[in-house]
Amino acid sequence: MEKQWWHGKIAYQIYPKSFFDTNGDGIGDLPGIIEKLDYLKDLGVDIVWLSPVYRSPLADQGYDISDYYDIDPRFGTMDDIDRLLAEAKKRDMYIVMDLVVNHCSDEHEWFKKACADPEGKYGQYFYLRKLRKAAELKTGTNSEAAGEVSESEKDGAAGDVKESEKDGAAGESFGTALTAAVENRTADGGEAFAVCSPDGYVLPCNWRSYFGGPVWEKLPGHEDWFYLHVFHKKQPDLNWENPGVREEIYTMINWWLDRGLAGFRIDAIINIKKALPFHNYAPDRADGLCTIGRMLQEASGVGEFLGEMRDRTFKPHQAFTVGEVFNEKAEELPAFIGDNGYFSSMFDFSETVWGNSHAGWHKNKSIMPDDYRQCLFDTQKKVSDIGFISNIIENHDEPRGVSRYIPPQDMQSMDEQMRVTAKKALATVYFFVKGLPWIYQGQEIGMENYPLQSIDEVDDIASLDAWNVMLRQGVSEEDALRAIERNGRDNARTPFQWSAAANAGFTAGSPWLQVNPNYTKINLEQQAADPSSVFCYYKKLIALRKNPQYCQTLIYGSFDPYLEDRSRVISYLRRSSGQTILVLSNYGKETRILPLPAPVKKILLDNCEGNDLSVTNSTVTLSGYRTLVLEL
């Protein structure tokens, strides 16, 4: 593995809408990010990823882009983004933006032109099909029902990398009105069937969108034309089989990199390659549909697109890129993040998808400490020296890490001091595994999930669909609400808690999403003044990883699990020539005596600093959630 400039850096994700509002409209903005750059610099952050700020109707919070070359006025202007890039450069910081190119907005000019002329140039920018009604068909296949496919799609097939099903969604396309309608339709290893729209059109395939319902929606202004959307119906998929689409995308990427952007986080990128021609799979719910993940399991060939994109855009600019890739196979890692990989890095989602169920959020299993450890260690063993993984405990699509990876029963039964200790323990065990550590806004102060009182408080479209799915399956409203409270994306999107002032100091107006009521107890202003706080501990984590005496071991040293057979112990060794560092966490409430692999030379970090510590040459006694970083 070649050493890269970013290996020793600290990365931070900003969800702009919820970070800091400067104009009182209740929405975070680019001037707010500029104002807080010194805060991020003081924390120790080097790389800042902004979730989308492009012009957008915000149907999916900016992941539906209507103009890739402009900033949405709710966030600011192009002058603001240029000023942000300039101010970041002054501080030796790097700005990374979201790259969302599996789909665009249905309000993008390309899609409007496709609607005006489905058989014209821009109709080929998307997956459009002229369909026939079931009543018109007596024999044939779904492909025949769908009409002719374009030449560019005939040889298509999506990537070997499987993206995990993200349960939940809006259910706004065809709802439950789907019916198994026409005989002699091919299915995946099962009985032949087809699914139809409510008005009887036979759909080309029975894939379920990430946001619920079928992936096919009627093209505006047309009776028998439909378009594909694997996410929300306002996010039509771009046809990557069309070289003209790829050229448009590469031109846009290079335009941003030439403007001074350091790189991109690449959104949902495995979805760009579809399994073509369209066909059904065995349904996995009563709606007659199957998860998109099933299609991605079968698909192959995405690497051709990713390699071309790398060579045409990222590589000439030496850009930093991190991919959103789910459930990749070990043999694919060199192609993705090796020395000439498609991306600089990619996120480890193994723990975020653990226990997820296709049946609905109420069926998701809670991840326990030993499960979390297994996910963490399996990824480290799999990646090894192939490349540099990006490590997270939360992001804008996930619940808060401290509410997920610290057992809820522990959080509820512990006093405030021990909860702080547990939050520091979680921070430590993920921070020093091999790879690039990412901090999501609010994580550094231990922000927690929002305590839902009503479904009316929920904004997230995935959560709202999950609610409908659960109620249709007979789940009580109370149980459904608790499932959303555990799994919903709004948990990460509540405004940053800057202070105990009104609206947590986020805005002088009315916040677009409610502030977590615990902001009077959990906020930056209080923690910055408290040396024992979660925030001050994160500063210590960052300082240790950057310490010249230890950074080579913590960045490039080998990773060796320790005490893997001990339940509720998360421990590992980082080794380099002449130096060994042990991370040792008693990840439970009870005091334990744990063996040491060698005598301790120095305590580098202690999440209970100031408390007595019993250490011998061969053992250490750790109280509940006490966690140490030791030089041996």
Regions found by a protein language model. Give the residues of each.
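Active-site and adjacent substrate-binding regions of carbohydrate-active enzymes
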Residues: 1-155, 159-632
